[in-house]
Amino acid sequence: MKKTNITRNHLTFLAAAILCCLFAAGADAADGKLRIMVFGAHPDDCELKAGGVAAMWAKLGHKVKFVSTTNGDIGHAIMAGGQLAKRRTREVKAAAKILGIESHVMDNHDGELMPTLENRKALTRLIRDWKADIVMGHRPNDYHPDHRYTGVLMQDAAFMVTVSNFAPDTPQLNKNPVFLYLSDYFKKPNPFAPDLVVGIDDVVEQKAEALWTLQSQIESFWSARNFETVIPVPTDPAKRAAKKREFTQAFGRRTRGTADRFREKLIELYGEKKGRSIQHAEAFELCEYGRQPSPAELKKLFPFFGEN
């Protein structure tokens, strides 16, 4: 009898331990925190288009991962190949640390991304592994082929993430994420029409600080506006500080432009007073693939608007 009691005690302890493990394993899904994945074609696209909103989600404890679908290995006037790919990966990892998020760079050559079955499966696995509630990426009409095909691949994954026998090595998602597009200026076949415009005034300096880590782009395309010239970032402290101020002001003009461009939407979402006062913004358009949230659910997924 005594031996039986010990056995039962052991079984009770074991059952309790198993339950604890199960609850711990599901903690991320049950903690009420959102999981967001943003796809950009190059190691800077996510940071440029969604760095502000990512920092805001992160401050609220939500989990954000930026994914570059190419390694950026030709995005410089002089440097290229593996050396540049490694440099740009280091840069976006540093930017992610500033924003309070995670970063991943896929090993596809810059300028050579194709909407292949292999890449469709790769994006599907990434979304599933992250257990994403929200997925964002480029629209498929864009000036750069890598941007276009990133958009196509995201659209293709929008349904396949729920199909159990597609890429069956990762469990399908039982709830389809909400998919959204990052902003752009292209008009044909249809212009970007945001469903959400988020004021980022409180984090615009944090976003600029993250972008400042992308030195390979600052010294090349962002400064020279071509891929033939390098304008090195000064090493002299005073000149470097002046360059940083110039850089911060330039990107401030971009986010101010977004706020001004979509002022009426800001007023609709934030109310008249707040909507008119916002100086810096990022904008996102709902994709017609994936889960179609109500306006009320969208505001829960983007919990930045308050009551108006």
Task: Indicate residue ranges for each PLM-predicted region.
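Short acidic, glycine/proline-rich loop/turn micro-motifs
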Residues: 76-79, 190-194
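Active-site adenylate/phosphate-handling loop in enzymes that bind or generate adenylated species
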Residues: 126-170
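Bacterial N-terminal signal peptides
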Residues: 10-24
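Functional cores that coordinate and move charged inorganic groups
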Residues: 147, 152, 156, 179-181, ...
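N-terminal secretory signal peptides that target proteins for export/translocation
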Residues: 1-8
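Active-site rim/loop-helix segments in enzyme catalytic domains that contact anionic ligands
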Residues: 28-130, 136, 152, 160
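Active-site cores that bind ATP or allylic diphosphates and position pyrophosphate for catalysis
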Residues: 163, 173-177, 181-182
